[in-house]
């Protein structure tokens, strides 16, 4: 049975003071039994957050990592092996802001995916379509292509140690949210695509939904059969709101 997961992507938010306050609030949160909770702070604060959440049942991940697994001459980057050494468990790969704003290609994302796994991190592969692509009826084509890029490079077995987050680009930070049924339809298509290669991998992989998830809509989204939790943006910056989302996943 798949374990529900709630992941908080803090993006480029936080000061030392606000991160300390948020970390303390999360540490006081009651985690429902049987769910996995992870947070992804800015790289600058990863050590502080890991220290502050020790023994609290919350794991920590990174928002980005380098294309090579080991440390070396790559200015401005952080190696996944370095992230693993300090205690990170997960790393986001392919978030739409990395794809669109930074311009990361499928080739670069595949290298990051492989480097993360080689270093013992679990990649959270983010996929999703723009509003233009959805309105053109290309949602499943786009999501399928993004998923196939990894499958074609590394085989379906790569998803035995990975998480997939479907984040429609048009719903990230806009207040717009895919309806529970819209999200479920895409998640079901993702699982079907994986099952065509390996039914067991498809059955076991966690599929998260991201895109303006909040306490008010989390329960309905998480009640869908192929939605195993959420990748939360803005709402993860408030410990009370994030806690309510975690409780929704626990139910």
Curated annotation (Swiss-Prot):
InterPro entries linked to this entry: Aldolase_TIM, TIM_sf, TrioseP_Isoase_bac/euk, Triosephosphate_isomerase, Triosephosphate_isomerase_AS
Localization, UniProt: Cytoplasm
Top-level division of the source organism's lineage: Bacteria
Binding-site list for substrate: 9-11, 173, 212, 233-234
GO cellular component: cytosol
CDD domains attached to this UniProt entry: TIM
Listed GO biological process terms: gluconeogenesis; glyceraldehyde-3-phosphate biosynthetic process; glycerol catabolic process; glycolytic process
Residues of the active site: 95, 167
Catalytic activity field: D-glyceraldehyde 3-phosphate = dihydroxyacetone phosphate
Pathways involved: Carbohydrate biosynthesis; gluconeogenesis; Carbohydrate degradation; glycolysis; D-glyceraldehyde 3-phosphate from glycerone phosphate: step 1/1
Keywords: Cytoplasm, Gluconeogenesis, Glycolysis, Isomerase
Subunit structure as annotated in this protein's UniProt entry: Homodimer.
PANTHER family (alphabetical): TRIOSEPHOSPHATE ISOMERASE (PTHR21139:SF42)
Function comment: Involved in the gluconeogenesis. Catalyzes stereospecifically the conversion of dihydroxyacetone phosphate (DHAP) to D-glyceraldehyde-3-phosphate (G3P).
Protein name in the entry: Triosephosphate isomerase
Source organism: Pseudomonas putida (strain W619)
């Amino acid at each position: 049975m798949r374990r529900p997961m709630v992941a908080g992507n803090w993006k480029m938010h936080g000061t030392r003071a606000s991160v300390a306050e948020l970390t303390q609030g999360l540490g006081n949160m009651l985690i429902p039994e049987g769910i996995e909770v992870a947070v992804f702070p800015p790289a600058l604060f990863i050590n502080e957050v890991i220290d502050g959440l020790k023994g609290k049942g919350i794991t920590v991940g990174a928002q980005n990592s380098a294309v090579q697994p080991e440390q070396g001459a790559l200015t401005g980057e952080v190696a996944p092996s370095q992230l693993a050494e300090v205690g990170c468990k997960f790393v986001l790969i392919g978030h739409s802001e990395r794809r669109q704003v930074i311009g990361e290609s499928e080739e670069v994302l595949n290298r990051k995916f492989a480097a993360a796994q080689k270093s013992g991190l679990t990649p959270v592969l983010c996929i999703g379509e723009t509003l233009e692509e959805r309105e053109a009826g290309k949602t499943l084509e786009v999501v399928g292509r993004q998923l196939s890029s990894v499958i074609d490079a590394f085989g379906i077995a790569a998803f035995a140690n990975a998480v997939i987050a479907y984040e429609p680009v048009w719903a990230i930070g806009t207040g717009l949210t895919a309806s529970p049924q819209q999200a479920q339809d895409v998640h079901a298509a993702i699982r079907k695509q994986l099952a065509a290669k390996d039914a067991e991998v498809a059955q076991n992989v966690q599929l998260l939904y991201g895109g303006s998830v909040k306490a008010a809509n989390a329960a309905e989204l998480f009640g869908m059969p192929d939605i195993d939790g959420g990748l939360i943006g803005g709402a993860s910056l408030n410990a009370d709101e994030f806690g309510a989302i975690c409780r929704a996943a626990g139910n």
